Amino acid sequence: MYVIVVDFDIRPDRLAAFLPLMQENAAASVRDEPGCHQFDVCQDPDAPHRIFLYELYDDRAAFEAHLASPHFRSFDAASADMITSKHVRALHRL
């Protein structure tokens, strides 16, 4: 399995707008992408503007399909000015 973890820092004044966009992207990913098995959106309780994603795909090709999906492209465009930093890591689940 192919794992993606993402750490976001979100502008605090844009957090309320960002969260529903992210939650809809996560739901659409699991619902509409056969290769996406899990998409968890987590929030740091001590720093609510820090968002962590855990995504589980069949393989890299399934993740690439996610990046090309209409729901991801829409989310990416809508949230671009809300994000102050983003760190993405790809891992293989053992």
Name these PLM-found stretches.
Residues 16-19, 64, 73:
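Generic structural signal for individual residues within well-ordered alpha-helical segments
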Residues 14, 59, 71:
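Short phosphate-engaging motifs
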Residues 40-49, 75-94:
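Glycine-rich beta-strand-turn "strand-cap" elements at beta-sheet edges
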Residues 22, 66-67, 76-79:
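Short, flexible helix/strand-to-coil boundary loops that buttress conserved ligand/catalytic motifs
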